[in-house]
Amino acid sequence: MKLLLLLFFLNQPPVDTTAKSGRFIAMEYKGMSNCIYEITINDSLIMGAKVNGYITIQPNFGIGTSVPRDVMHNPEAYVNKKKAAKYQDKNMGNDQFISTDGQNFIIRRKDIKSVFINTTPKWGMGYYPQSGRIMIESPETAYNKTAIRDLILVGDQNAEEVLKMFK
């Protein structure tokens, strides 16, 4: 049985662990809870779209969502496709984007005071892999209600490549 499992994993296609241009997947803690964001970066804005709610380890006893262990290294496995589909309208304005989910955020790039990688593992992540934390400091605004964002890179992502997106 162990040999079959080993052969199964050895024959899996490689997971693309490089950050896609201007986009990455991150978790942010909200008190005792958390949520998953798809972060999109363009020339002037950083937009965080909530694409999944509370992520828990297994067994979750019906509370939250668990990412199966066999795909937990793939950042896309943390995204709820139904929630992500709400953001397919490329002509969505800022107000509509924010009203799609109250936890969404928009930060103007020119407002960023600092952005850096925190390599300290986030406590409470259980067995979920994390590739570092992107820390963004910016002023609170109507579109960004948190001055310091602690975005945990879930799965296998290259923190240095993600940081380059902000440069």
Where are these regions (language model features)?
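Sec-dependent N-terminal signal peptides
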Residues: 1-11
